Design a protein with these regions (language model features):
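Hydrophobic/aromatic beta-strand patches that form the interior of the parallel beta-sheet core
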Residues: 47-49, 77-79, 127-129, 200, ...
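The Walker A/P-loop phosphate-binding site
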Residues: 2-99, 298, 312-315
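Structural recognition of the conserved hydrophobic beta-strand(s) that form the central parallel beta-sheet
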Residues: 160-161, 197-204
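Cytosolic-facing regulatory segments adjacent to core modules
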Residues: 32, 36, 71-155, 266
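Flexible loop/turn segments at secondary-structure boundaries
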Residues: 56-57, 84-89, 166-170, 207-211, ...
């Protein structure tokens, strides 16, 4: 049958021997103690990020990508029109890299020399896809196929879409949105595994739900086509904060697959606007801010997460 075959020993011999010797491949540690047990990132995988505008989802995603570049030398493909043009994207990355801002009203206003130094390193590790024709558009599948070409050319480990709404979606060819997602998301999973690349997607929720006058932290069902995202997704992360002024961000792990990369649950993290960096608060030493570090190279297998996992659940 075209596009399929019966599995043979030669197809899996090498990978199965490696799995027997090393076990399931863990993700790399992303620098935060608060996140350690809940989420790690490995090269083959997909992560979907959701949250209302100004929830911090893009900032945390970029922070995780920046940390993997800084700690492990990873390279990333970005198609992020939701952030803004290429200058806006670079200004955010430069702020993270240097700890200095382009806003003149702050004492850590960056010099042009630091801009050039930062840009050189960042453009080596972040391959930013720029639209040159205002009429041009790209489908998710076209982007993911392009990411595989970039992996061959530049050695990238991840590719990011921010956001899903900025892609061209040919719903009518598949009988509607739900059927469309059922077509494109399994394709994403397959090429991620085949080509050992991590694919990130930012998806905006639908109209906010309210409870007691407050906006509710979005769940999978708040995503357009939530059932399909839940069925085909691997890792789904939802961010929420009570107000745009708050630096405290609540993070829910709505789905984790495979279990070796994290666990379901909730953690909190904080954002330092002056540095454009996230941090943990160490209450044991007077509420000290702890920014991401590479002290722990990889997340260790989480025995609690494994023990809490329903072993009779094949998914």
């Amino acid at each position: 049958m075209k596009g399929f075959k019966i599995l043979e020993h030669s197809d899996i011999e090498k990978d199965l021997e490696l799995y027997h010797r090393l076990g399931a491949k863990k993700g790399v540690y992303l620098g935060f103690k608060s996140m350690k047990d809940f989420y790690s990132m490995r090269e083959s995988g997909v992560t979907d990020w959701t949250g209302y505008p100004s929830s911090g989802k893009t900032e945390l995603l970029l922070e995780c990508l920046f940390n993997t570049a800084n700690f492990y030398g990873w390279k990333h493909l970005l198609y992020v029109p939701d952030i803004g043009d290429e200058i806006e994207v670079m200004s955010i990355l430069i702020h993270k890299y240097s700890g200095m801002t382009f806003d003149k009203k702050y004492p850590n206003y960056i010099s042009i020399q630091d801009v050039w130094r930062s840009s050189s390193w960042l453009l080596e590790h972040f391959k930013i896809l720029k639209k040159t024709d205002p009429k041009a558009s790209i489908t998710p599948i076209e982007f993911w196929d392009f990411a595989i070409e970039c992996k061959k050319e530049f050695g990238i480990q991840t590719a990011t879409i921010d956001s899903w709404k900025d892609m061209r979606h040919d719903y009518s060819l598949h009988g509607g949105y739900a059927q469309y997602l059922s077509h494109v998301l399994p394709y994403r999973n397959m090429i991620s595994e085949q080509h050992n690349i991590h694919l990130h997607t930012v998806i905006h929720p639908k109209t906010p739900r309210r409870q007691d006058g407050k906006i509710v932290h979005p769940d999978v069902d708040d995503m357009e086509g939530g059932a399909q995202w839940n069925n085909s997704g691997k890792v789904i992360i939802s961010l929420h904060r009570e107000s745009k002024e708050a630096n405290h961000v609540d993070v829910k792990m709505l789905k984790i697959k495979p279990k070796i990369v994290g666990k379901w649950g909730f953690f909190a993290i904080n954002f330092d606007l002056s540095k454009s960096r996230y941090f943990d608060i160490n209450s044991e030493i007077g509420g000290t801010k702890e920014y991401a570090t590479k002290e722990i190279i990889e997340s260790k297998p989480n025995s609690e997460a494994i023990s809490n996992y329903q072993l009779d659940n094949p998914f």
